[in-house]
Amino acid sequence: MQIRFLGQSAFLLTSGVHQLLIDPFIAGNPKSPVTLEEALGWKVDAVLISHAHGDHWGNALDFGRAGVPVIGTAEIGGYAQKNGAQNAIGMNIGGTYRAPWGSVTLTPAWHSSSFPDGTYGGMPTGLIIEMDGVRVYHAGDTNLFSDMRLIGDRGLDVALLPIGDHYTMGPEEAARTLELLRPRVAIPMHYGTFPVLTGDPQVFAREGRARGVDVRVLAPGETAEV
């Protein structure tokens, strides 16, 4: 699997002929390495949304109106459908959606969720994605919580974790989650996009590697092979 970091919490996952786009904050993202026009040209199987805040919901409707399935909570699915997405799939925490590309399971996250227009976005979530035998946990926006151990019990290959502080956990707390999640590889996200997100990825890398985890710090546009 190739995991391409697109800035903030956006990632493009590629495995064989399949591609998934997570939290597609592209237009308006000062760290995005691609334009929205470029991204809309990708052959994406689905767009996965952790929660409804603008820096995660992002350009979901642009993809949804172009026919790409938009997957998230029931509230996110309903909002997407109401606003022109051709194939919106609403789920809830604990549920799994299966497709030819693999599966996604929604997990809890400790945060909040509302759309840019103020509409309630349901519960914030994390995402466990399985593609071709690789299991990736995208934590969304969250703090450390003890039930991360249960997520780790599923056997994670990769954890994508917010480290920016202020709205989520900072780098030291994010490193502590690795003791519960126990992934092979960890990649930091949700930092440096705006001045308030001061978490240092090198602190996370140092603390994570001290716990025996392969931490990979990606610049926007860079790709990790896992």
Swiss-Prot record:
Disulfide bonds: none annotated. It comes from the Bacteria. GO terms for molecular function: hydrolase activity. Belongs to the UPF0173 family. This is UPF0173 metal-dependent hydrolase Dgeo_0136. Keywords: Hydrolase. SUPFAM superfamilies: Metallo-hydrolase/oxidoreductase (SSF56281). InterPro entries: Metallo-B-lactamas, RibonucZ/Hydroxyglut_hydro, UPF0173, UPF0173_UPF0282_UlaG_hydrolase. It holds the Pfam family Lactamase_B_2. Coiled coil: none annotated.
